[in-house]
UniProtKB/Swiss-Prot annotation:
Part of the high-affinity ATP-driven potassium transport (or Kdp) system, which catalyzes the hydrolysis of ATP coupled with the electrogenic transport of potassium into the cytoplasm. This subunit binds the extracellular potassium ions and delivers the ions to the membrane domain of KdpB through an intramembrane tunnel. Disulfide bonds: none annotated. This is Potassium-transporting ATPase potassium-binding subunit. Keywords: Cell membrane, Ion transport, Membrane, Potassium, Potassium transport, Transmembrane, Transmembrane helix, Transport. The keyword Membrane applies. It comes from Mycobacterium sp. (strain KMS). Belongs to the KdpA family. It is found in: Cell membrane. InterPro entries: KdpA. The system is composed of three essential subunits: KdpA, KdpB and KdpC. The chain crosses the membrane at residues 6-26, 65-85, 133-153, 176-196, 249-269, 283-303, 378-398, 419-439, 483-503, 526-546. Its main location: membrane. GO terms for cellular component: plasma membrane.
Length: 556
């Protein structure tokens, strides 16, 4: 069996597994967020934080709760990192100094669900920071995205009200009822597959084949690895991330990790369909995600199987930066889905991909990570694109556009259009400023088109809250730590504010009855329109800079 055939079978098995859990997991998440009962542990949490679970919030109050919780989380994680040398389970001789700029960048990164890492995890962060800081944020940052998605869906489903639910209820339920039990199951599976789970620091010394002594770092890896993937976080315990054999030792664990990073995002459309009272609407959104993901994965595997240069031609594929235990095809599947979602974990190194393979990782993020996107963020991003599509279709036939019985007035389309413009502006302005400053260009280890691609990738990853990187860019500097931190903050919270404002606007409307001129939003025609609008908008926005970077490199 050829490696390409094996890779196709690998991808098909993942698709079948995701299809199998789509309905039960989507229905379970619907029951979690629709339930009127509170667990005892949840009631304790409400009392601790002083929240009234029976109180509904409008979009402004919901947004303020999101921002307040995230701000406190950033401050806590920032302080924990700077003080870790005085706390238990710290590293005695960290390889990288934890400066305020790096602590800021890391705190923002994990709170925004980006998990961009400008440091080597196993030689910089102690176990207490990994467990009480980074792992906790892996849970709650994912739960925040899911909460915002549920608030937006309620805005579409409800009428004549300004209430979108309760952020604190959504946050705690998402963490305790969905992410925690699934991550426990995932961690047990990963441990059984060989992922380590211990409290060893840097005190395990072994003899190498040549007789030298080597220190092997350990830690509670499996427990962090499960939520790292499940919550589409992506920050690795080790610098090599999921390419490290302690995080991802076999093809089986590789398959499990890809499944974990995809399952919630691909199941949320089912939850959406149940909440709006039409499973067909959820199926249509899922179909858009599946079409884009299939196109992207096909191109990624094609480009990574291309052979340019003496060594790739002799080997038969582009193997640089690829772990041989996974192979090119399986690594391409991981790379594609980690950038289609907001995960950013890697089992191979994207900077070593072919120019067009690297282009696909960039383009996937520039889509807004909507196919399926991050947990929660992918769903609300796709629904905003659906709103834009309905508006465009309404212009074509000369009717007031409607989506799920809600009219799209000038206020709604302004919010949706602004939502779409935020991230491209962050990415393009950040890249332009970095390229214009001579001091920042010194951090580029490559010149020419690939050097531009590395800077573009950094700001694309930060602005879209992905976290993966083209590693040929030295980013642990005060400027990059600050600039990329700001890109992560604005790229996370400006879209959240806009999507909650849009949800509040929809919730205040009544329901408009369907008429002969209403565009059906559950048919293949609509699926094709949303797919087309998504691809065209992204192509028009980013094609010029992609032409200067990976496309120019590919032509060269």
């Amino acid at each position: 069996m050829s490696t390409t055939t094996a890779g196709i079978l690998f991808a098909l098995s993942l698709a079948l597994a995701l299809a199998a859990v789509h309905v039960p997991l989507g229905d379970y998440m619907y029951r979690v967020y629709a339930s009127e009962k509170h667990w005892r542990a949840e009631r304790v949490a409400y009392r601790i934080i002083g929240a009234d679970p029976a109180a509904e919030q409008g979009w402004g109050s919901y947004a303020r709760s999101v921002l307040a919780f995230s701000a406190v989380s950033i401050l806590f994680l920032f302080g924990l990192q700077l003080l870790q040398g005085r706390l238990p389970l710290h590293l005695n001789d960290p390889a990288t100094e934890m400066t305020p700029a790096l602590a800021w960048n890391t705190a923002v990164s994990f709170v925004t669900n980006t998990n961009w890492q400008a440091y080597s995890g196993e030689s910089t962060q102690g176990h207490l920071v990994q467990m009480a800081g980074l792992s906790v944020q892996n849970f709650v940052s994912a739960a925040v995205g899911m909460a915002v998605a549920m608030a937006f869906v309620r805005g579409l489903a409800r009428r004549d009200t300004g209430e979108l639910g309760n952020f604190w209820v959504d946050l705690i339920r998402g963490s305790l009822r969905i992410l925690l039990p699934l991550s426990i199951i995932g961690a047990i599976i990963l441990v059984s597959g060989g992922v380590i789970q211990n409290f060893a620091l840097h005190d395990t010394v072994v003899s190498t084949l040549s007789g030298a002594q080597q220190t092997i770092p350990g830690g509670p890896v499996a427990s962090q690895e499960a939520i790292k993937e499940l919550g589409t976080n992506g920050g690795g315990f080790f610098n090599a991330n999921s390419a490290h054999p302690f995080e991802n030792p076999t093809t089986w664990t590789n398959w499990v990790e890809i499944f974990l990073l995809s399952c919630i995002a691909f199941s949320l459309p089912r939850t959406f369909g149940r909440m709006v009272g039409s499973r067909k609407q959820g199926a249509a959104i899922l179909a858009v995600m599946a079409v884009i993901a299939t196109l992207s994965l096909s191109l990624m595997m094609l480009f990574q199987s291309q052979t340019h240069g003496t060594v790739p031609t002799a080997v038969g594929s582009a193997t640089e930066g690829v772990e041989q235990r996974f192979g090119v095809a399986d690594s391409a599947v991981f790379a594609d889905l980690t950038t289609l979602t907001s995960t950013g974990a890697v089992d191979s190194f994207h900077d070593s991909y072919t120019s067009l393979g690297g282009l696909m990782t960039l383009f996937n993020m520039q889509l807004g990570e909507v196919a399926p996107g991050g947990v929660g963020s992918g769903l609300y991003s796709m629904l905003v694109l659906a709103v834009i599509t309905v508006f465009v279709a309404g212009l074509m036939v000369g009717r007031t556009p409607e989506y799920l019985g809600k009219k799209i007035t000038p206020r709604e389309i302004k919010l949706a259009a602004t939502y779409f413009l935020v991230t491209p502006l962050i990415v393009l302005i950040g890249t332009a400023v970095a390229m214009a400053l001579p001091g920042q260009r010194d951090g580029m280890l490559n010149t020419g088109p690939h050097g531009l691609s590395e800077v573009l990738y950094a700001f694309t990853s930060a602005g879209n809250n992905n976290g993966s990187a083209f590693a040929g860019l030295s980013v642990n500097t005060e400027w990059y730590n600050t600039a990329l931190g700001l890109a992560m903050v604005f790229g996370r919270f400006l879209p959240i504010i806009l999507v909650l404002a849009l949800a509040g606007s929809f919730a205040r409307q009544g329901r408009t009855p369907e008429s002969v001129g209403t565009l059906p939003t559950h048919r293949p025609q609509f699926v094709g329109m949303v797919t087309g609008v998504t691809l065209i908008l992204v192509a028009l926005t980013f094609l010029p800079v992609l032409a200067l970077g990976p496309l120019a490199e590919g032509l060269h």
